[in-house]
Every structure is written in C-alpha cells, then in structure tokens.
Amino acid sequence: MSRAKSPSPTGIPTQSIIWAAIGWATLALMFYLFLSAPTDGPHIIKPEECNKVVKDLIVRPNWYRYGTYLFQTVAITFSGILCLRNWRSPKIISGRNVWLGLGLGILSWGIGNLIFGYLDFQYQSGLIAGGAKGAANLVKTFPSIADIFFTATYVFLSWGMAMSVIGRRLNLYPKQWGVVGAVGFIGIGLAAYVTFGAGGGFTLDTGKILNIVYALGDIWLLIVATILLLAFWGGKAAQSWRLLGSAGIAMFFSDLWFNYSINISDICKAKPYQSGEPAEFFWILAFILWGMAAALEFDLSSRPTGRSRRG
C-alpha cells in the first residue's frame, strides 16, 4: 500500500484515505471493546407480550448507542461515495458495475440502519418510560420499513460481488475449489443453525422469511469472498480484490451474530436485543474494507500505463 500516493479528484492522496480508514477502524474497535457494557439501570418494565413485570433490566446508555451509529454512518458514507466514484470514472479497469452494486448496497444499508436505529431508540425509550405500569403500542424494530432497505442491500451487494468474479479467468486449482465448497458448506450450516435452530424452528411469518433471505445473501457473500481471496492472493495489483473478499467475510459474521442475537433475545427474562454489541464492529470493518478497496482500485486505474509513459 506504500505506493498508493496519487491524489483523488478531491485532492486527497489515496494513502491518506487508507490511513484515515485504518484510524477510524481502530477508534471504532476501542469504542466497542471498552465502552459497550450495559450500565443504565436497573429498570422495571412491563412489556405487552409478558405476563408479569420484568425487573433488573440493564441497558447500554444512549450516549454509547449514538456513538455506535456515528461510527457506522461515517464508515458507510465514505465507503459508498468511494465506490460510486469508481463507478463514475471511465478509468476503472475492473468493471464499473462492480462498484455500482457495492456503492448502492452500502448506501442502502446505511439508510436502513438509520431507520432501524430510530425505531430501536423509540422502542427502548418507550419501554423504560412505561415502567411497571407497562407500555402499549410500541414500535417494532423487526420486521420494519428498514428491512426494505436491508433487502435491497443484499440484492445490490450480491450483484456487485458477483460482477467481481463473473467473466474473469480465476484459474483455481481443484483443491481451491474444494476449499470454496467446504467454506460454503460451513456457512450454510451456521446460517441454518442461526435461522432455524436458535430462531425457534421453521415458520413462514414475515420475520422468518426475511431471516432466510438475509441468510442466503450472507452465504453468497461468503462464497464469493472466499473465491476472491483464493484467486487474488498475490500481487499488489490484486490488493483491492483481497480487501473485497475480506469485507464479504466480515459482513457474513456480523450479520450472523446480529441474527443470532435477535433470535435468542427474550424481553420477558430481561434479555432483550440491544444494539451496540461488540460484534457490530465487523459491520464497520466490512464497510471500511470496501472503501479501502475502492480507493486502491481507483489509484491503480489512474496510474499512467507503460505505453503512455513512453509517449
């Protein structure tokens, strides 16, 4: 990455973008690791779905939750912009549709995340404000209108990641294809356990259908990410593709943990889902890696070729 010094159209050197991304990821990691403990409480609540009062509810403070959304939104915004910059540039040699899909997917996820965050704050605030008397007509965080954007995210990301491998001469050895198959099999097993095992069996309600859609999208991202890592393991010119693969894997694990947390939550036992889990850092990591990949690919594509240097 030491050669990535060419300036972007905004005048910011690519190397500065890379270091800023690494710095933001480091700050986010420390924020999640050291400040994520629930400290607000205990509260006494009476949710509608519970037969009795729930005591000793301890939640994460709002200032911490605001901080997590700040870290996520900044990473999403800059990564989405960098991906769309690649799509608009005629110099990109890697296929502009790759970056269009990634950019739209990232920004769609960001919109859905902000909507989900608003609903999550409304739900928890109303629940605590209701106290032992109970709170009625609370907003639902899942499923909600935010899932429209999350579903669109999987469509765009799956398309963008697919474009990164379709039409390319991958030249994987049989053993490498075996690794891809094994990773896919493990991913299917993990997703099935989270969706159906921890999720309470097979049903066809809206929430379960969405979980299945998300699981399928995550499995696809994991498989494509594995292919990219195996096919583009060496060489500086392949750095952006390795970062794309790493981002897909980070997205898989963060989504898997989110679905698991939702499925095992039980508000009646004072164990509700709470945003701000340390595992959410992998969302930020995924978006940062996508943004770094976009910056490196733009830098590589903007360099003069040997022919042009010879005049």
What kind of feature is each model-predicted range?
Residues 2-311:
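Polytopic alpha-helical membrane-helix bundles and their juxtamembrane interface segments
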